[in-house]
UniProtKB/Swiss-Prot annotation:
The protein, known as: Hexokinase-1
Summary of the function given for this chain in its UniProt record: Catalyzes the phosphorylation of various hexoses, such as D-glucose, D-glucosamine, D-fructose, D-mannose and 2-deoxy-D-glucose, to hexose 6-phosphate (D-glucose 6-phosphate, D-glucosamine 6-phosphate, D-fructose 6-phosphate, D-mannose 6-phosphate and 2-deoxy-D-glucose 6-phosphate, respectively). Does not phosphorylate N-acetyl-D-glucosamine. Mediates the initial step of glycolysis by catalyzing phosphorylation of D-glucose to D-glucose 6-phosphate. Involved in innate immunity and inflammation by acting as a pattern recognition receptor for bacterial peptidoglycan.
Keywords: Acetylation, Allosteric enzyme, ATP-binding, Charcot-Marie-Tooth disease, Cytoplasm, Disease variant, Glycolysis, Hereditary hemolytic anemia, Immunity, Inflammatory response, Innate immunity, Intellectual disability, Kinase, Membrane, Mitochondrion, Mitochondrion outer membrane, Neurodegeneration, Neuropathy, Nucleotide-binding, Phosphoprotein, Repeat, Retinitis pigmentosa, Transferase
Involved pathway(s): Carbohydrate metabolism; hexose metabolism; Carbohydrate degradation; glycolysis; D-glyceraldehyde 3-phosphate and glycerone phosphate from D-glucose: step 1/4
Region feature (Hexokinase large subdomain 1): 208-447
A Gene Ontology term for the protein's cellular component: mitochondrial outer membrane
UniProt-annotated binding residues for ATP 1: R30, D84, L85, G86, G87, S88, S89, N345, R425, R426
Organism: Homo sapiens
Phosphoserine sites (modified residues): S337
Subcellular location: Mitochondrion outer membrane; Cytoplasm, Cytosol
Superkingdom of origin: Eukaryota
Modified residues (N-acetylmethionine): M1
Topology in membrane: Peripheral membrane protein
Activity control: Hexokinase is an allosteric enzyme inhibited by its product D-glucose 6-phosphate. Hexokinase activity is inhibited by N-acetyl-D-glucosamine.
Length: 917
């Protein structure tokens, strides 16, 4: 017993002694964490260079766009062929994907040889061989008559400009077929298939094996966004933000980047850590000076690295008593599989003895211990280097997401990772030290990258079909110039019907006379009250207008809420609430005494018989108060003031908010004679010649016409451009069948149109993984402000996702892109339709005056126009295109329509004074 313990102690001492000697001898291969962190920094810089348009041509890490934009979402289905070429053998698979109830994938595959004479021959020989194997595979399965989609895993660096094209940059590993570098491998394969003529194949996607691995694992774990191969060769890919990829148009979404990290160091950036053995390996390789990182870490070279170290140590008398055999000197006699066998925990030393004996040396126990430690140092260095480069990718992903802690999955494949007994454990341990703020799950790719090629093909098929259906749906929102000219023509016709006495009663665009006959001339003076009612908030203002050399307008205002129960209660309750708010304001300003002139901005369709009388035609924008329609709103206001018995007011004018906006802007800019509101609702007004206003006596001068254009289309004249979604929104609105034009362009409804489209797309499985949340079912959830935020060019998709999450919608990156697209299509149509209406107005003014060219200013207000990032630009462009003879300027009303009501009151008081004198 004691003898055995002594022997064990002696052996341990001996082993420790040998280990120390080897550590000293191979000191340059032992990398500290400090060195590894430095390598991470270098690789991060190389990644940045590869993604940059300016630096990519000279970058060693090519960061190739793969045009794979999406990982599987579980809804893929179909029958696919996958080809897998890139390693020691060539595999063909038939992959049947079914997503009914349980996702399942049925695969059958066959492995074909790729002999040396083929991989080192001509390109046509290589692809003829691939086509022949594919023919054999299809023949055996009786599927030659089916034109199945094919995914092609081609594990070499390729330049892609689309998913079904791959131009080979350079051969790696043992491949050297001539005439292929610089050519599109899809064309070469198609040519070989066509030459045979006995079957047809549709090559949908070419992917790198690393991308294939990511996609294979992505089918099982949708958090998988990195692919890693550590086998014969080594490489990694990951999902990069498109905005960082200079080589590809667009900045929405993500794309898988094939890093081709095997070439890291080809520019000399790793010279300080390369050893004499690395240089010797490189000199004897098929591609000297290339793939230097791969030659330090991949399975193709580790065995050879160990052999070179053993030869040198033997020559120096440090091993095998200085004996060198012909076998030990022969390249390829010591493989990476031997390294794996020697590093096994229990039988490693026994395996070392067997392998070394096979090489003709007669190893001592010392020799076996030394060789085992050489293998450990070489494979450990590989694991450390791969951990450093993967760590750089994980840090980039974390930064892209703007998250303090990254949670992600890495799909892994490759013989070295899978079969080496210690590799994965060491690799994971080093990675955890290098990136402590990342939680990484490693998912082993059980079925290789062939299944991944099929998944890429399945995803491409799914996305193509989805894209077709999405485009088909959204095409109904695209308006051509001819369609917009037709809308302009119809608006013009409806305007004429509204102006004529004979047709006015049946006209949908009411063209209501406002009895505002002039815009301000600058001589207005005095203190005026203004009320502004038109939405959920109600404003009371005190406006002090001063004329003279320096004209000034000083305003004080207070905002009051109108509860929904009052909006939809009785008319008496509504006007009592308004008067109560006025009373509070007069107290607040300390002016509850003199009888002040008041202008009332009332933003609903009214038939006016004078400046201070307006009969409500219909409620809009969610108001439903009873006993108001058909009544004079000024009388209702005066009655409520009398009921309160606290104060009296001189109600001089009732005006629409659009007219108020025009007057506000006309005070600043005399050429302003059109008003436009595009906010919660939409409307326009303009100065019409009195001779055309048949509803009012007199032919001299002008009068502002409140168009009430929101009702355009209520007679069915826009039915050909209204979509299924417009009809849905109308059907469930408070005023079904009314204000149809407004429901296509105003802020109150755009979000609802978007919501209905999103529900439809979710039902079809295009969004939110097919799950319709309670939030999405909630009417009114998509406020216009969210549309404006989502469409902002400044917002990255992460922020779009954050907005959707605020709304209770958990979206992927792809979901966010589609939501943004839908918002864009809906708001663009709104801006174009609004522009077509405005074009009809300005052309009418021009023709009224018999002008070749008209210069006119439009005063504009409304949240949609003000806040939406693209609405105003698209609307202006549309007006310009549809009315080329009008030079139209747009002036934003900064002070709302309340100031306009005060100005109309001031003009009214001035005209009244002039008339009495």
């Amino acid at each position: 017993m004691i003898a055995a313990q002594l022997l064990a102690y002696y052996f341990t001492e001996l082993k420790d002694d040998q280990v120390k000697k080897i550590d000293k001898y191979l000191y340059a291969m032992r990398l500290s964490d400090e060195t590894l962190i430095d390598i991470m920094t270098r690789f991060r810089k190389e990644m940045k260079n590869g993604l940059s348009r300016d630096f990519n041509p000279t970058a060693t890490v090519k960061m190739l766009p793969t045009f794979v934009r999406s990982i599987p979402d579980g809804s893929e289905k179909g029958d696919f062929i996958a080809l897998d070429l890139g390693g020691s053998s060539f595999r063909i698979l038939r992959v049947q994907v079914n997503h009914e109830k349980n996702q399942n994938v049925h695969m059958e595959s066959e492995v074909y040889d790729t002999p040396e004479n083929i991989v080192h021959g001509s390109g046509s020989q290589l692809f003829d061989h691939v086509a022949e194997c594919l023919g054999d595979f299809m023949e055996k399965r009786k599927i030659k008559d089916k034109k199945l989609p094919v995914g092609f895993t081609f594990s070499f660096p390729c330049q892609q400009s689309k998913i079904d094209e791959a131009i080979l940059i350079t051969w790696t590993k043992r491949f050297k077929a001539s005439g292929v570098e610089g050519a599109d491998v899809v064309k070469l394969l198609n040519k070989a298939i066509k030459k045979r003529g006995d079957y047809d194949a549709n090559i949908v996607a070419v992917v790198n094996d690393t991308v294939g691995t990511m996609m294979t694992c992505g089918y099982d774990d949708q958090h998988c966004e990195v692919g890693l191969i550590i086998g014969t060769g080594t490489n990694a890919c990951y999902m990069e933000e498109l905005r960082h990829i200079d080589l590809v148009e667009g900045d929405e979404g993500r794309m898988c980047i094939n890093t081709e990290w095997g070439a890291f160091g080809d520019d000399g950036s790793l010279e300080d850590i390369r050893t004499e053995f690395d240089r010797e390996i490189d000199r004897g390789s098929l591609n000297p000076g290339k793939q230097l990182f791969e030659k330090m870490v991949s399975g193709m070279y580790l065995g050879e690295l160990v052999r070179l170290i053993l030869v040198k140590m033997a020559k120096e008398g440090l091993l095998f008593e200085g004996r060198i055999t012909p076998e030990l000197l022969t390249r390829g006699k010591f493989n990476t599989s031997d390294v794996s066998a020697i590093e096994k925990n229990k039988e490693g030393l026994h395996n070392a003895k067997e392998i070394l004996t096979r090489l003709g040396v007669e190893p001592s126990d010392d020799d076996c211990v030394s060789v085992q430690h050489v293998c450990t140092i070489v494979s450990f260095r590989s694991a450390n280097l791969v951990a450093a480069t993967l760590g750089a990718i994980l840090n980039r992903l974390r930064d892209n997401k703007g998250t303090p802690r990254l949670r992600t999955t890495v799909g892994v494949d490759g013989s070295l990772y899978k079969t080496h007994p210690q590799y994965s454990r060491r690799f994971h341990k080093t990675l955890r030290r290098l990136v402590p703020d990342s939680d990484v799950r490693f998912l082993l790719s059980e079925s290789g990258s062939g299944k991944g090629a099929a998944m890429v093909t399945a995803v491409a098929y799914r996305l193509a079909e989805q894209h077709r259906q999405i485009e088909e749906t959204l095409a109904h929102f695209h308006l051509t110039k001819d369609m917009l000219l037709e809308v302009k023509k119809r608006m013009r016709a409806e305007m004429e019907l509204g102006l004529r006495k004979q047709t006015h009663n049946n006209a949908v665009v009411k063209m209501l006379p406002s009895f505002v006959r002039r815009t301000p001339d600058g001589t207005e003076n005095g203190d005026f009250l203004a009320l502004d009612l038109g939405g959920t908030n109600f404003r009371v203002l005190l406006v002090k207008i001063r004329s003279g050399k320096k004209r000034t307008v000083e305003m004080h205002n207070k905002i009051y809420a109108i509860p929904i129960e009052i909006m939809q209660g009785t008319g008496e309750e509504l006007f009592d609430h308004i008067v109560s708010c006025i009373s509070d304001f007069l107290d607040y300003m300390g002016i509850k005494g003199p009888r002040m002139p008041l202008g009332f901005t009332f933003s609903f369709p009214c038939q006016q018989t004078s400046l201070d009388a307006g009969i409500l035609i219909t409620w809009t924008k969610g108001f439903k108060a009873t006993d108001c329609v058909g009544h004079d709103v000024v009388t209702l206001l005066r009655d409520a003031i009398k009921r309160r018995e606290e104060f009296d007011l001189d109600v001089v004018a009732v005006v629409n908010d659009t007219v108020g906006t025009m007057m506000t802007c006309a005070y600043e800019e005399p050429t302003c004679e059109v008003g436009l509101i595009v906010g919660t609702g939409s409307n326009a007004c303009y100065m019409e010649e009195m001779k055309n206003v048949e509803m009012v006596e007199g032919d001299q001068g002008q009068m502002c016409i409140n168009m009430e254009w929101g009702a355009f289309g209520d007679n069915g004249c826009l039915d050909d451009i209204r979509t299924h979604y417009d009809r849905l929104v109308d059907e469930y609105s408070l005023n079904a069948g009314k204000q149809r034009y407004e429901k296509m362009i105003s802020g109150m409804y755009l979000g609802e149109i978007v919501r209905n489209i999103l529900i439809d797309f979710t039902k079809k499985g295009f969004l939110f993984r097919g799950q319709i949340s309670e939030t999405l079912k909630t009417r009114g959830i998509f406020e216009t402000k969210f549309l404006s935020q989502i469409e902002s060019d400044r917002l990255a998709l992460l922020q779009v996702r954050a907005i959707l999450q605020q709304l209770g919608l958990n979206s992927t990156c792809d979901d966010s892109i589609l939501v943004k697209t839908v918002c864009g299509v809906v708001s663009r149509r709104a801006a174009q339709l609004c522009g077509a209406g405005m074009a009809a107005v300005v052309d009418k003014i021009r023709e009224n005056r018999g002008l070749d060219r008209l210069n006119v200013t439009v005063g504009v207000d409304g949240t949609l126009y003000k806040l939406h990032p693209h609405f105003s630009r698209i609307m202006h462009q549309t007006v310009k295109e549809l009315s080329p003879k009008c030079n139209v300027s747009f002036l934003l009303s900064e002070d709302g329509s309340g100031k306009g009501a005060a100005l109309i009151t001031a003009v009214g008081v001035r005209l009244r004074t002039e008339a009495s004198s």
